[in-house]
Amino acid sequence: MANPTVIKLQDGNVMPQLGLGVWQASNEEVITAIQKALEVGYRSIDTAAAYKNEEGVGKALKNASVNREELFITTKLWNDDHKRPREALLDSLKKLQLDYIDLYLMHWPVPAIDHYVEAWKGMIELQKEGLIKSIGVCNFQIHHLQRLIDETGVTPVINQIELHPLMQQRQLHAWNATHKIQTESWSPLAQGGKGVFDQKVIRDLADKYGKTPAQIVIRWHLDSGLVVIPKSVTPSRIAENFDVWDFRLDKDELGEIAKLDQGKRLGPDPDQFGG
């Protein structure tokens, strides 16, 4: 089996291409989920202040037999804290029982309030202080990203967006790549695979490779150059989602999955959300 792949970010830092998402997991659930994830080989964990499970993540990491240097921990600045990123980060660090965060992401731009440039400037300072290794954003559209770059001169290393076979965001993905911004997929299985896992192309590829539909979709993200963070608290599913290193999809197969794109957003519209 091939080793899990890593991605080099534009700031020189390296992150695993496949991580564990913990959205909607309780503090108790997240402890057992992370224990299982580390056991099967995950080294990247993606949480957020808004998930209200950073304390559980912290306990799991505290008890882990994996060295801190081997782990890649992401958390996120919530919308209410755009004017106080320092306090928000220190609160997250305390809950996570960590000295630094590998990747700190602004969770939403919230253009109705329009503090995202101010928040970004604060995140830049926190990175300079060594409290954060890398800084990025989630759910930013091209015009939000361009404004950050124009007003601060600092480009996010990551843009984590809703991305799955029904919502492929190819224009944004390409724009990110042109600006050396790594695209990361949230809700990569389209919230449990509804409308995706039953597609003929997905089922046919699952049969061909002896894999599950979820594994095919995760491999599609990986082979499309995306960082991907499938969420699960089920031990068997956590293991299944990581068992994707012994096959690859070819160009034609990726192209067939590309045809599933409907521009179908399952989550909020970033131009409207918050505020």
From Swiss-Prot:
Its EC number is 1.1.1.-, 1.1.1.346, 1.1.1.2. It holds the Pfam family Aldo_ket_red. It is found in: Cytoplasm. Its main location: cytoplasm. InterPro entries: AKR, AKR5C2, Aldo/ket_reductase_CS, NADP_OxRdtase_dom, NADP_OxRdtase_dom_sf. NADP(+) binds at residues 187-241. Substrate binds at H107. Transmembrane segments: none annotated. GO terms for cellular component: cytosol. One of its GO terms (biological process) is methylglyoxal catabolic process. Belongs to the aldo/keto reductase family. Aldo-keto reductase that significantly contributes to cellular methylglyoxal detoxification by catalyzing the NADPH-dependent conversion of methylglyoxal to acetol. It also exhibits fairly high activity with glyoxal. Shows broad specificity and can use aromatic aldehydes such as 4-nitrobenzaldehyde, 3-nitrobenzaldehyde and benzaldehyde, and phenylglyoxal. Shows beta-keto ester reductase activity toward ethyl acetoacetate and a variety of 2-substituted derivatives. This is Methylglyoxal reductase DkgA. It comes from Escherichia coli (strain K12).
